[in-house]
Every structure is written in C-alpha cells, then in structure tokens.
Amino acid sequence: MVDPPGNDDDHGDLDALDFSAAHTNEASPLDALDDYAPVQTDDAEGDLDALHALTERDEEPELELFTVTNPQGSVSVSTLMDGRIQHVELTDKATSMSEAQLADEIFVIADLARQKARASQYTFMVENIGELTDEDAEGSALLREFVGMTLNLPTPEEAAAAEAEVFATRYDVDYTSRYKADD
C-alpha cells in the first residue's frame, strides 16, 4: 500500500478520537469502594419473591349470586347480595316478546332476585349478630325484628312467598308445593 505524501506516522487520523484510557495494572482509588458494594447472590430472583407476593393479584373472591328465572326460561336475572343486578341472561325464547313485554319481564324477575338477595342479607345478619351476642330466645326475636323492620329486609320465607305469588298470578303456575318441600 502506498502512503500518501506527508503521512510519515503509523497511526490513522481517527486515533485522535480514541478517549479510552490505556490499560494499566495500577490500582485505582475507586477500587476501595468495591468493599462496600452489595454482594451479588446466585439466587437474585429468590430475593424478590417476597415482593412478588405483594404485587400479585389475589384471586378475586367468589361473589354469591342470587338468580331467579321465569317459568318459560326466557329471562334470568342474577343479583349480588345487596340487590344490585349482576347479570341478565336472555334465551332465544325472549325473541317472541315485544320490547315492552321483555322490559316488564326483566323488571319483575329482577325484583324477585333482589328480594331473594336481600333475604340472604337478613339471614346473614341474624345468624352472625346472634353468634356475636349469644342472645337468648327473646334477644333473638328482638334482633330479627330489628333487622326486618329497621333495615327493611325480607325474611327468606317472605321472599319465597313473593316469588310464589308472582309466579302463580303472572304465569298461572302453582309453585307452592316447591316451597313446602324445602321445609
């Protein structure tokens, strides 16, 4: 290779941009900081397992749903324990109803599901408060009266009677035998 005239040295022009330090074996004053550096463990992920448990989502608690379905099976409404509607399910049979009929049917079934859920609140409160207070028969009667009258929660029997009445009057179906069998 021929060197251009005036280029007598053995290095290229880009050597001026090499800012790296020359490799030396001399100890640097910064080497003393190595004594204070955190020790790297072989199981680095194991140290973080405790933090993962804090950030992982727990399984969502399974909510108890209270569902009522009309006798035709065209409308089902599921509510949460507080009476809020969680899910409305319609089958193909609902297509034969007009919009107004369907809205009315959903409303009626949702009200029954709400009563069923609120009756569960009644049972929950009477059982749990009764356990906490160890009430006698008179105290239990007062507690049931308080929960029923003050909180306006129906008993499970009242909710079942309301469902039987609606089904008997609205659909000409006798469901009283169904509720007597549960006794």
From Swiss-Prot:
Ranges for region Disordered: 1-32
One Gene Ontology cellular component: plasma membrane
Inactivation phenotype: Inactivation does not abolish EsxA (ESAT-6) secretion, EsxA-specific immunogenicity and enhanced virulence.
Biased composition annotated in UniProt, kind: Acidic residues: 1-16
Superkingdom to which the source organism belongs: Bacteria
Coiled-coil parts of chain: none
BP-aspect Gene Ontology terms: response to antibiotic; symbiont-mediated perturbation of host innate immune response
Protein name per its UniProtKB record: ESX-1 secretion-associated protein EspH
Gene (UniProt): espH
